UniProtKB/Swiss-Prot annotation:
Gene3D superfamilies: DNA methylase specificity domains. The keyword Repeat applies. InterPro entries: Restrct_endonuc_typeI_TRD (IPR000055), Restrct_endonuc_typeI_TRD_sf (IPR044946), Type-I_RE_S_subunit (IPR051212). It comes from the Bacteria. This is Putative type I restriction enzyme specificity subunit S.HindORF215P. GO terms for molecular function: DNA binding. The lineage of its organism: Bacteria, Pseudomonadati, Pseudomonadota, Gammaproteobacteria, Pasteurellales. GO terms for biological process: DNA restriction-modification system. Belongs to the type-I restriction system S methylase family. Keywords: DNA-binding, Repeat, Restriction system. A putative specificity subunit for a type I restriction enzyme; the corresponding endonuclease and methylase subunits have multiple frameshifts and are probably not expressed.
Amino acid sequence: MKNNRTFLEKLLEGSEVEWKPLDEVANIVNNARKPVKSSLRVSGNIPYYGANNIQDYVEGYTHEGEFVLIAEDGSASLENYSIQWAVGKFWANNHVHVVNGKEKLNNRFLYHYLTNMNFIPFLAGKERAKLTKAKLQQIPIPIPPLSVQTEIVKILDALTALTSELTSELTSELTSELILRQKQYEYYREKLLNIDEMNKVIELGDVGPVRMCKRILKNQTASSGDIPFYKIGTFGKKPDAYISNELFQEYKQKYSYPKKGDILISASGTIGRTVIFDGENSYFQDSNIVWIDNDETLVLNKYLYHFYKIAKWGIAEGGTIQRLYNDNLKKVKISIPPLKEQHRIVSILDKFETLTNSITEGLPLAIEQSQKRYEYYRELLLNFS
């Protein structure tokens, strides 16, 4: 913290920093704001701003110049309150305060400072938090010399531009790499898993019986609780329903329940989506989520996992299917090489899948790291307290 202050002190060179209420150092130009229903907007090239972003492009404008837009209500996040930068001609609706600095306050300095500020103490209301004009006017703003404001803006703008450039480059490069790796994975998957006359061909019903969990009634679920309950809409995603541990333990003992490593399959909606069951306590919607009870004497579960991605579920090309019935599932043919060869194939396909996933996960991570770098320096440069 000492180094942080020293860095800022070097910029200040002994100059004092005044704190002023926002309405003393900035203009609040809300009078021209005008909300327009989407059905009444005339399409054009002028950005139409709402609380969080540009909502449309219209003809006409309410403001022209450089302004900071602060959500009045409807901010997507209260912790990271919505602050936008508007330049040129634009249209502002009544969900944003429109502000620009007076002679002692650099507009971009105000923008960066507000993006680093905690707005929660200034908000009124619970269900739809609101920043009233009266509270906005009271927000304390640090006023270092304009030369210091300009230098801080120069540094933070450079970091913002670097983050944007890096995001664009990473997205372009990694998307191309992702497409290439995905195609490689699909090529080898098709080559290694398709029907081979040299291998034994069986039906999935020969691998093991089709299983599903016991039906869970709506009144047995809650929005929070002990055991996540996955429905077809949340399969492979975040659960939005839960069941009690008592019910889970009872049903787990009495009825079918997957083993760790079993491959769960979606039997409605998008047919054939898969999840490798990790063994964690959870429950799954009956008939919509099924699995083959596989003892792995004939087929490895991981081999099934990769096979399901190319399986033909008994429908014509271009056709649709509302449900994968057990009989359809059991009749799907699969080529099974010896277990040793299955291990080799799984090893190859796992590597391709890992490479593909590493790009998918790496892109947001790299962007997040760049954003954190900007936030670190923003905090360092704007911590006048």
